[in-house]
Each structure stands twice: as structure tokens, then as C-alpha cells.
A protein has these predicted regions:
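Intrinsic N-terminal pre-sequences and regulatory tails
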Residues: 1-8, 137-138
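N-terminal signal-anchor/start-transfer transmembrane helix
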Residues: 5-30
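Hydrophobic cores of alpha-helical transmembrane segments in multi-pass inner/ER membrane proteins
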Residues: 9-18, 49-51, 77-87, 122
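Cytoplasmic membrane-interface regions of multi-pass membrane proteins
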Residues: 23-34, 89-104
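Juxtamembrane helix-loop boundaries in multi-pass membrane proteins
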Residues: 34-51, 71-74, 104-122
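Long, highly hydrophobic alpha-helical transmembrane signal-anchor segments
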Residues: 45-67
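Short alpha-helical packing/oligomerization segments
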Residues: 63-94
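Juxtamembrane boundary at the C-terminal end of a transmembrane helix
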Residues: 125-138
Length: 138
């Protein structure tokens, strides 16, 4: 269905941009304002949930009848990016409440190497899925 195709592209694009926002805002200064809006807790939660739900939906609703695996790659990437976003949000809020600022600052400074790579993968999956809609694994 065309709706799931569009939702898959949009969810992967936004989730990938959200995860790799630090890297993208350094490279592309014109996107800094948009990426700052996506870095809020509510935006990350909604984007993560949307990526997971759309990823699950595109697994069960194929794009065309002969393509069984047509949306496999974007679906898996969308679910992975969504899980990473939700894990990041819930890790910040649930594990480290506001009464422990020193420990929270130390954890916030630790490098999250997976964020940029997984975000770039989600971004690339969205772009490839947009330009190559009827390929077997895209």
C-alpha cells in the first residue's frame, strides 16, 4: 500500500535524522534548527514509536503481491532505529532521576557510537527506499 510506503520513508527519515542529529548539525548548519526540535524527549518518543509501529506494519502489509520481502530492509532498520530511540529516552528518564546530577552528567558524557551509525543507516534506508520503491530488498 502506498500509505505504508510513505510512512516507512518518513519514519525512517525522521528517526535517522533524530539519532544522527549531533553529527548532522555539525556538518549541515542549515538543519540545526530542525534537528534541535527533534531532539526533545517528546519528539524522540513519538518518532521512536512511529518507527517501530510502521516497521511492524510494513512487515505484514507488502507493497505489491509478488514482493514478499519488498519492505524487509526498511522495516528492520525502522524497528532498530525506533528501539534505539526509545531505549535512549527511557534510559535517561527511568534509570537516572533528577536527584543524582553527578551520575547523570557522567552518563550523558559517555560516547554513544551507535547513534550516528544507526541514524545514518535509517536515513540511508529512507532515501534508498524512496528512490528505489519496487526493488526486492528496498
Amino acid at each position: 500500500m502506498l500509505q505504508f510506503y510513505f510512512l516507512s520513508v518518513a519514519a525512517n527519515f525522521l528517526a535517522g535524522a533524530t539519532l544522527s542529529g549531533d553529527w548532522m548539525s555539525e556538518r549541515f548548519t542549515s538543519l540545526a534548527r530542525l534537528l534541535a526540535a527533534l531532539s526533545g524527549r517528546r519528539a524522540r518518543t513519538v518518532t521512536g514509536l512511529a518507527a517501530i509501529l510502521v516497521g511492524l506494519g510494513t512487515l505484514f502489509v507488502p507493497a505489491a503481491p509478488p514482493l514478499v520481502l519488498g519492505d524487509l530492509f526498511p522495516s528492520i532498520v525502522g524497528m532498530a532505529v525506533g528501539i534505539a530511540l526509545l531505549f535512549e529516552v527511557f534510559k535517561e528518564e527511568a534509570v537516572f532521576p533528577g536527584d543524582q546530577p553527578a551520575r547523570g552528567e557522567r552518563i550523558a558524557k559517555t560516547p554513544r557510537a551507535y547513534r550516528t551509525a544507526l541514524g545514518a543507516l535509517g536515513f540511508a534506508a529512507a532515501v534508498l527506499h524512496f528512490f528505489l520503491p519496487e526493488r526486492l530488498f528496498l
